[in-house]
Design a protein with these regions (language model features):
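Helicase motor core with emphasis on the C-terminal RecA-like subdomain
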Residues: 1-143, 149-158, 173, 181-196
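Non-catalytic terminal extensions of ATP-dependent helicases
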Residues: 37, 62, 103-106, 113-284
Length: 284
């Protein structure tokens, strides 16, 4: 990433999928002497705003960020967008890459891909949707009294069930959506219905199960884009518009590689067709 960033003049954005990776890349570029800022959702609002303003005014050349950086970003002279890790899908990739070259001048959109990037997105996907057992456990706990005699809260559920926080959060989201539980402003949880059957709980997951399958397909399409040998613009437009362009873009890495191989093959064929001295003698 350092070599790519140094090779491209002008301002740019480096996207990472996780906060930890964003911080590591930011530190590496900073140590390399780059003018670089950091932006992710765990930073204080004031610090995020300061970094964004410095990037927009040109005080910082590079912004390393998670997908939290994007809304309202319209800097016309961004010369590159580098995805250090693969995003969750082509829509996100297109939107984030589309921040480059808005002034109409050439810009580079680069995706670095490693197989472990898929595992990162798969981890996020697994944490986004509850399993039946997790929903059952949260509901059963809410129907009982907390062991510490206090009100149920997210923290109390996490301590009681010893389950990941994000799993409990998504289970609570399902129950809130179906008006089974209410979460008050102070974090307290109160039951609105205590007569939900196991069958009803299972049916609540149907919509989430369908959405999960869609998100899984979206991820697989992103992996296909990263690994394909086809014209990347063709793959992207096929996803966005439902049909491929009539011609290849001739600017992506795959098209350029095909063009080089074609030119080499044509040159080799031309050399093979050139009569050799022995051929000339034989033909006389």
């Amino acid at each position: 990433a350092k070599a790519l960033v140094k090779a491209i003049p002008g301002s740019g954005i480096v996207y990472a999928a996780t906060v930890r990776t964003a911080e590591a890349v930011h530190e590496a570029l900073k140590q390399a002497g780059e003018s670089v800022g950091l932006y992710h959702g765990r930073l204080p609002i004031a610090q995020r705003r300061e970094a964004q303003d410095a990037f927009m005014t040109g005080e910082l050349r590079i912004m390393v960020a998670t997908n939290a950086f994007g809304m309202g970003i319209d800097k016309p002279d961004i010369r590159f967008v580098l995805h250090y890790q693969m995003p969750s899908g082509l829509d996100s990739y297109y939107q984030e890459s589309g921040r480059a070259g808005r002034d109409g001048e050439p810009a580079d959109c680069i995706l670095l891909f490693h197989h472990r990037d898929r595992a990162v997105q798969q981890f996020f996907l697994a944490g986004r949707y509850p399993e039946a057992k997790e929903l059952d456990d949260v509901y059963a706990a809410l129907c009982s009294n907390p062991s510490d005699a206090g009100p149920w809260t997210l923290e109390a559920l996490q301590a009681e069930l010893r389950a990941p926080r994000n799993k409990i959060q998504v289970a609570l989201a399902v129950l809130r959506q179906r008006r089974v539980v209410r979460q008050h402003a102070d974090g307290r949880l109160s039951m609105l219905r205590a007569d939900v059957s196991a069958e009803d709980l299972a049916s609540m997951l149907d919509l989430y199960r369908e959405k999960r399958e869609q998100d899984q397909a979206t991820l697989e399409q992103m992996v296909f884009y990263a690994q394909t040998g086809l014209c990347r613009w063709e793959v992207l437009l096929s996803h966005l518009q439902g049909k491929a362009p009539a011609q290849r873009c001739m600017t992506c890495d795959n098209c350029r590689r095909i063009a080089v191989h074609t030119a080499q093959a044509q040159e080799s064929a031309a050399v093979d067709c050139t009569p050799r001295p022995s051929d000339k003698a034989a033909s006389i």
